Amino acid sequence: MAKYEILYIIRPNIEEEAKNALVARFDSILTDNGATVVESKTWEKRRLAYEIQDFREGLYHIVNVEANDDAALKEFDRLSKINADILRHMIVKIDA
């Protein structure tokens, strides 16, 4: 299984319940498509290097994933691009 790290930035003005639902939804997208979520944790609110969609801060969330193929990652990528609550995301393959 290949290991991946996913980092995404959530808009800072989201309510706590909505943030938790968003994180749970995107974790389930990964698991429903065959990936295993090893760790999913929220960093704190951090200042952005530059303004994104009129926001100067964002809530950083990091997910460590193991997957046999990239189907789960492609689905995560596709859905995070169209979700207004996610400002940016990045998927990195970890060399073992």
Curated annotation (Swiss-Prot):
Kindly state a single biological-process term from the GO annotations of this entry. Answer: translation
Keywords, ordered alphabetically? Ribonucleoprotein, Ribosomal protein, RNA-binding, rRNA-binding
Is DNA repair a UniProt keyword of this protein? Answer: no
Alphabetical list of InterPro entries matching this protein: Ribosomal_bS6 (IPR000529), Ribosomal_bS6_sf (IPR035980), Ribosomal_S6_plastid/chlpt (IPR020814), Transl_elong_EF1B/ribsomal_bS6 (IPR014717)
Which residues pair up as cystines?
none
Spell out the coiled coil positions from the record. Answer: none
GO annotation, cellular component aspect:
cytoplasm; ribonucleoprotein complex; ribosome
Alphabetized Pfam families for the sequence: Ribosomal_S6
Q: Per its UniProt entry, which superkingdom is the organism in?
A: Bacteria
Supply the SUPFAM superfamilies for this chain.
Ribosomal protein S6
**An annotated Gene Ontology molecular function:** structural constituent of ribosome
Q: What is the stated purpose of this protein?
A: Binds together with bS18 to 16S ribosomal RNA.
Return the similarity comment. Answer: Belongs to the bacterial ribosomal protein bS6 family.
Official protein name in the record:
Small ribosomal subunit protein bS6
Q: Which gene encodes it?
A: rpsF
